[in-house]
C-alpha cells in the first residue's frame, strides 16, 4: 500500500513506518505466526529462511536463519518482552554476522488506518555508531522487499 519510510531520531533511534491494505489483526498475525513469517520475511529475491522458530509470548524466544543459496547467510535471535494482541509487540534482538551485534530494542505498533494498517517500528540501539553500521547494511531494501512479499499474502 505504501513504501517503507525511515527516519532517525536522536543518536540511537530509527523509526520505520509502512501502510498495509489489511487489518491490524492480519498484519500482527503475519509478524507472530512462524508459518507466515517464513513465507514473507526473506529480504531480497533469492534468500530463504530454513529455520524459523517463533514463540510469540512474553518471555518467548525467536530465531530466524537466512541463506542466499550461495554459501552466505546470517541469523537473528531474540526475546519477546511484551505482546498486546493485534496492536503492539516489544522485543529485543541481535543479529549474528557471524559475531553478534549489540541488542536492538524494538517496539512495533499496528494501528488501524482507514481500511488498512499503519505499522510503526521504533528501534533503539545502544549508540550512534551501532545505528550507523546497521543502516549502512542496506537493511531498508531487504525490509521493503519483505513487506512487498507480505502484502501479497495478506
Regions found by a protein language model. Name each.
Residues 1-46:
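Hydrophobic ligand-binding cavity/cleft-lining segments
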Residues 11-17, 49, 61, 75, ...:
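Intrinsic-disorder/low-complexity, polar/charged segments enriched in Ser/Thr/Lys/Arg/Asp/Glu/Gln
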Residues 15-21, 55, 65, 79, ...:
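Generic structural detector for well-ordered beta-strands
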Residues 48-92:
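Glycine-rich portal/gate segments that line the openings of hydrophobic small-molecule binding cavities
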Residues 13, 90-141:
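Beta-strand/loop substructures that line and gate deep hydrophobic ligand-binding cavities in soluble
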Residues 27-28, 37, 62-64, 80, ...:
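Hydrophobic pocket/interface hotspot
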Residues 24-25, 55-57, 81-88, 109-118:
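A short, structured loop/turn motif at beta-sheet edges
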Residues 8-10, 54-56, 70-74, 99-102, ...:
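A generic structural micro-feature
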